[in-house]
Amino acid sequence: VDDPKIAEYRKAHEEITGSVPDYWASANTYAALQILEQAIVGAGTLDKETVTQDIKDNTFDTVKGDLSFKNNFSNTFWSVGQWQDGVFRGVKGSNVDGAAPVRLKDGWK
């Protein structure tokens, strides 16, 4: 993975758990927990409505970069990935930089 934050996360995950994290959901799950932690701290309470409002109103520093939500949706994400030379790379996304060109495989048109 070319992104330094995700590479650091993957290394720490493997050191702590002894298992290699998957290339799709693991960092997403960790980012969601980072958002929740920051929202609780920002809200200063565990009250569901207050924490929810903090998530709606703020941008959060996560392993996947700065994330925010509009109408309950984050518009920053990778939607398609492809294995290339043993590395899982993002090839299509929304508001993300660094997409690798899609490599057509033999027989693809």
Give each language-model segment a name.
Residues V1-K109:
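Extracytosolic ligand-binding ectodomains
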